[in-house]
Regions:
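Pocket-edge structural micro-motifs
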Residues: 22, 74, 139
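Short, surface-exposed acidic-centric catalytic microdomains
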Residues: 27-88
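Internal catalytic-core helix/loop-beta-alpha segment
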Residues: 67-117
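Short catalytic/ligand-binding loop motif for oxyanion handling, primarily in non-cytosolic enzymes
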Residues: 26-29, 80-83, 118-121, 143-147
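C-terminal capping/extension of enzyme domains
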Residues: 1-16, 37-38, 85-98, 122-165
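Short, hydrophobic/glycine-enriched beta-strand segments
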Residues: 16-22
Length: 165
């Protein structure tokens, strides 16, 4: 088992939506970038939904988030895990998600990217979220969720567009 620690959130006071994963995978931890695995569809999905070009470097990815008032973090701050699969997570500790939500004055929605993020939200945070924040449980963009095509993910994830200016 390897000890894994999440990154700092990408957020600013204009953020309207907080997208939460579970814990960065091995490739992301190695590169110190959210959703760094080339087969993860997160960045391609956002680009499709937002009608933008797929960002090619991490600075452009962060700029895309800020431009569209999106924040990004993980539900877990620490865990032990062999490999990258959420099903291997043990000894988890949550991030301060409710506290971050309270620091984002325009936050309207929290989006869980996948089942483990959804389970962590329900376990640790859902009852303590600010009243105006809606929570959405959406399918994972992970390559492990190969049963859904990018177009299928976009159909489910388009719910976020209602919160964007």
């Amino acid at each position: 088992m390897s000890a894994c620690k999440s990154f700092a959130p990408i957020a600013d006071e204009q953020s309207r939506i907080l997208i939460l994963g579970s814990m960065p995978g091995i490739k992301s931890l190695e590169q110190q970038e959210y959703y760094a695995h080339p087969q993860n569809r997160f960045w391609r999905l956002l680009a499709l939904l937002l009608q933008e070009d797929v960002p090619q470097d991490y600075a452009a990815k962060q700029a895309l988030l800020h431009k569209h008032q999106l924040a990004l973090w993980d539900t877990l701050g620490y865990c032990e895990r062999e490999g990258s699969l959420d099903s291997s997570i043990k000894n988890e500790a949550p991030n301060a998600v409710v506290e971050l939500a309270g620091e984002l004055p325009h936050l309207q929605a929290v989006v869980c990217n996948g089942g483990k993020a959804a389970a962590a939200i329900k376990k640790y945070f859902a009852k303590r979220m600010p009243e105006q924040v809606q929570i959405f449980y959406l399918p994972s963009t992970s390559p492990a969720n190969a049963r859904l095509r990018l177009e299928d993910l976009a159909e489910r994830w388009q719910v976020i567009l209602q919160f964007l200016a």
